Amino acid sequence: MDDPELEKIKQKKLADMIAQQQESIAQSQIQVIDLNSMNFDSITSQGLVLVDFWAEWCGPCKLMHPVFERMAKKYRHIKFARVNVDQNQDISMKFGVQAIPTFIMFKDGKQVDRMMGAVGEPGIHMIAKKYQM
């Protein structure tokens, strides 16, 4: 027995399941980029990049890591990246990073915004929303 309405519902359900699976795959592929003196300029020179300046020994920095990763999945129009200040002192000195965590937004290679401290999800949300396309 062929019911066209039932077939239509099945096709819609299948399309929804495929779309959901593709979204899940896309979400899992989004990651925070580790920056160093070799890749910093090439990564920050194109589009929007929010950079987290952090250190291994910094408790507030470590608290921000999962928040930063969640926000990277939410705001896909922005690249999210990290600079370990102990391993990349030249980069942190270049941008005058004196407190950590410090978050700097770059647009096409130019610094356009900055926040300091463990700002949590509201802080990252605020800066990301400000540069939403």
Where are each of the predicted segments found?
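Proteins that catalyze or organize thiol-disulfide redox chemistry
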Residues: 1-50, 56, 66-74, 78, ...
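Rossmann-like NAD(H)/NADP(H) cofactor-binding core
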Residues: 51, 81-84
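Short cysteine clusters
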Residues: 58-61
